[in-house]
Amino acid sequence: MEESRADGRNPNQLRPFSCTRNPLDRAHGSARWAQGDTIVLAAVYGPKPGTRKGENPEKASIEVVWKPMTGQIGKQEKEYEMTLKRTLQSICLLTVHPNTTTSVILQVVGNDGSLLPCAINACCAALVFAGIPLKHLAVAIGCGVLEDGEVILDTNKAEEQQLKSFAHLVFPNSRKSASSKEPNQKEEDSERGLITSITHGVMSEEDYFSCIERGLAASSRISDFMRTTLQKQAPGDV
């Protein structure tokens, strides 16, 4: 029998999700994504003409700015920006608007654990609401490994203090299937990959693959929620 966590969830249970479309009027698209008490606002501006020095002018550029709840941005937040930029570049169709820059601004509203996955999910929704061309949707989930080897999903902040290691995983989810009840075989195959994988702490190969297996199984629940949300709130964009 699986033991309950301090908040009453079982190891595979995710916190409640919510997503609000375009809470920020001045952005081209925005989303407020919440997982329990972890809340992130993502705002998309662009595409705007021109790219920064060092960027490929034959493709669109993605710029990410992370704003913490309080204080100045630090090393961890800079790492979040880099991870988000790489992740978003991998899901956006960068050849559609060459020599342009799309800015994604993230504001942390609440942090009760699994902050980076929450931010990635917020970004994905905001990009859709802004009408940015995507190869596919993406869903992110946090997986924690306890000292006894137990894997728990969507960790809160208190749990993160007790982890031996953790993995933040981003899985692709066919963009086309967001408006399709039954994705075809090619789309189903594309959902089995891994876009981004960030690990921290001492993690064995067995623990890592256990995180991937459990995370992939749980990601379908986030995918279903995201599809339903996008169909309901912006049927023309998905």
UniProtKB/Swiss-Prot annotation:
One protein family per Pfam: RNase_PH
Annotated organism of origin: Oryza sativa subsp. japonica
SUPFAM superfamilies: Ribonuclease PH domain 2-like, Ribosomal protein S5 domain 2-like
Keyword list, A-Z: DNA-binding, Exonuclease, Exosome, Hydrolase, Nuclease, Nucleus, RNA-binding, rRNA processing
Cross-referenced Gene3D superfamilies: GHMP Kinase, N-terminal domain
Record annotation: effect of changing residue 160 to Q: Strongly reduces DNase activity
Gene name linked to the record: RRP46
Record-stated family: Belongs to the RNase PH family.
GO cellular component, one term: nucleolus
Protein name as catalogued: Exosome complex exonuclease RRP46 homolog
GO biological process: nuclear mRNA surveillance; poly(A)-dependent snoRNA 3'-end processing; rRNA catabolic process; rRNA processing; U4 snRNA 3'-end processing
Subunit structure: Homodimer or monomer when reduced or oxidized, respectively. Component of the exosome core complex.
Role description: Probable component of the exosome 3'->5' exoribonuclease complex, a complex that degrades inherently unstable mRNAs containing AU-rich elements (AREs) within their 3'-untranslated regions. May form a homodimer separately from exosome complexes and function in DNA cleavage process. Binds double-stranded DNA (dsDNA) and single-stranded RNA (ssRNA), and possesses hydrolytic DNase and phosphorolytic RNase activities in vitro.
GO molecular function, one term: single-stranded RNA binding
Subcellular location: Nucleus, Nucleolus
EC number: 3.1.13.-
Ranges of Basic and acidic residues composition bias in the record: 183-192
Ranges where the record places region Disordered: 174-194
Leader sequence residues: none
